[in-house]
Amino acid sequence: MVSSRAVVMAIMVLVTVQWLVFAEGYPEEDLVARLPGQPNVGFRQFAGYVDVDSENGRSLFYYYVEAVKEPDTKPLTLWLNGGPGCSSVGGGAFTELGPFYPTGDGRGLRLNSMSWNKASNLLFVESPAGVGWSYSNRSSDYNTGDKSTVNDMLVFLLRWFNKFPELKSRDLFLTGESYAGHYIPQLADVILSYNSRSSGFKFNVKGIAIGNPLLKLDRDFAAAYEYFWSHGMISDEVRLTIMNQCDFANPKNMSNACIYAIVESSVLTEYINSYHILLDVCYPSIVQQELRLKKMNALHANRTRLPYEWTMCSNRLNYSGIDGYIDMLPSLKRIIQNQTPVWIFSGDQDSVIPLQSSRTLVRELAEDLNFKTTIPYGAWFHKEQVGGWVTEYGNLLTFATVRGAAHMVPYAEPSRALHMFSSFMNGRRLPNKPDLKSSTDD
């Protein structure tokens, strides 16, 4: 896995680089002429801040990358990582689907041949304030939750489009993973509400796609233990106790037997990477990364006066735990009723938010919408191999797995992830038979 130290160095280079050359129609001060150590590329990059609350000094940091080819005609895709509190720049941009990966020593950059900017312009935002180098001058703003996070993102997008007016009319896709299962549906919901009230500018939202999303906490939690059991990681006894004694919808009702079983499950799975159960855990690497991170200076500290160091996932936030229990299915229902396509995709090696719960919740949502099955559950293909399994309801709701992928789908299976994303963005169904001409560049 890409080391956190390498990611940090890449991000520090990104926002400390000198801003040069004016880009017509785009903000001169945010244009990145070149990242030291990067390969030669033909696309432009922008990075900087957007104030979402000028009075209290609350600003969100973004990184925008143009598409490799024909960026003037390509759509715009927003990507948000989850957590809550993890960096979309450090995670999404420089670990998963952005144009560059740090080299092994963290001193340079190499091209990501499966970057999603082959298909779309990409926008990564560190949200909420307190994540990465997004900040507020008022410390109480770090006591936050879903509502304030989504409202800030709406303000961010409106003001970001003022920086990039040529992109206002572009097709917009909202994507992310994990706790973005809360961010993206609620953001799409408030955007559609904004559109209904606005007599002027309207967001041109064409679809949302979320990987291994937290949609309904009690169901996702329970599914994790079913996943452990189905993969031989916990005993029959532990699984049955959790099934019969644990009330994940109301943690206060959990019995002692439930708590003991959960502890036993934690012991049994202690030496497994829950986010990718096939990867070995490398303890020296983890410790070394943490030590290096703690010695890093805050990015752009002289400008933002951040009193803390950058980390992949923020320890500054006091994020509302109650918000994690909000059911996202009603938001998804409203989005779909607005004729906006929704894709839910799952890496099948993730035990944190496993495919079992996502698949079941998508089916229940389809039933609530009275949708018929428009694609029966079956394999989809990429490069003559099974890329995963997929089903579709009512031509608007899709559930797809990505074979061999995990919690961070684009990192674990970049080629299959790009093929899936390109299909989603272009309104194409995933192929249900091998195709010798299948390409990741479509």
Curated annotation (Swiss-Prot):
Family annotation (PROSITE patterns): CARBOXYPEPT_SER_SER
Active site positions: S178, D350, H407
Keyword Zinc-finger belongs to the record: no
Biological process (GO), any one: proteolysis
GO cellular component, one term: extracellular region
EC number in record: 3.4.16.-
Record-linked InterPro entries: AB_hydrolase_fold, Peptidase_S10, Ser_caboxypep_ser_AS
Record-annotated disulphide pairs: C86-C313, C246-C258
UniProt-recorded name of the protein: Serine carboxypeptidase-like 43
